[in-house]
Amino acid sequence: WSAVWAIPILTLSHFVLKKKIKLGYLWFLILPAAVYLATYAPMFLTGHGLDIFWGMQKQMWWYHTGLKATHPYTSPWWSWPLLARPIYLYTSNEVGGFVSRIYATGNPLIFWAGLASIIVSFVYSLKFRIKKLALVIFSYLVFFVPWAASPRIMFLYHYLPSIPFLAIALGYILRRNLKLIVPAVTIALLLFLYFYPHWAGLSVPLSLDKSYYWFSSWR
């Protein structure tokens, strides 16, 4: 359902690029709906009807709007760009001084430099009237800010649809500051190699595992 927010992005992009909305663009509504319906083909082929399909949609809506639950790794929507509260997906017991985790967190450089790039790009889009850059900022926000209205518990992974636009903004800023490209890519790569065992569930010494928790909220 997160993809629903792509519809206003596609619509706005045509206005930004000064293109008229034509009848053919209705496919942006028809095709996604058809693909979504097609994913339920196995259910329909086993004899279930539209009543079951509609019941599932209502159940999903209730899950996102009415579920009352708690979780130790929940995080508010505004904290996601700060990478304030990642989430454990798996953890093992210590065996011989080694432990393995699957820890859903991001590359700190991408998250934090990306957030700074979003802010700077927003300023540039206003100052220099760069419509395409404004579209990137809008796309980033439209996948992210609506979660502020959600009553359900939320996690860092709900931020993922905004990440591609964060990366575009980061790339734009780096392109305007070419001297930063090599250091930024190098640091991002080193951080990837450093965090990879923590992301992928590889067995590591306890001393290395403890080094991953830069902040108390990461534990």
Predicted regions located by residue number:
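Perimembrane helix-loop-helix junctions
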Residues: 5-33, 129, 174
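Hydrophobic/aromatic-rich transmembrane helices and adjacent perimembrane loops
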Residues: 5, 153-175
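Hydrophobic, aromatic-rich transmembrane alpha-helices
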Residues: 93-97, 101-130
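Juxtamembrane membrane-water interface segments that cap and precede transmembrane helices
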Residues: 79-105, 208-219
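Transmembrane alpha-helix segments characteristic
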Residues: 116-118, 128-148
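Aromatic-rich transmembrane-lumenal/periplasmic boundary elements in polytopic membrane proteins
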Residues: 33-83, 203-213
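Transmembrane helical bundles and short interhelical boundary loops of multi-pass, membrane-embedded
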Residues: 12, 41, 45-46, 176-219
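Membrane-interface catalytic loops of GT-C/OST-like multi-pass glycosylation enzymes that act
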Residues: 147-160, 198-202
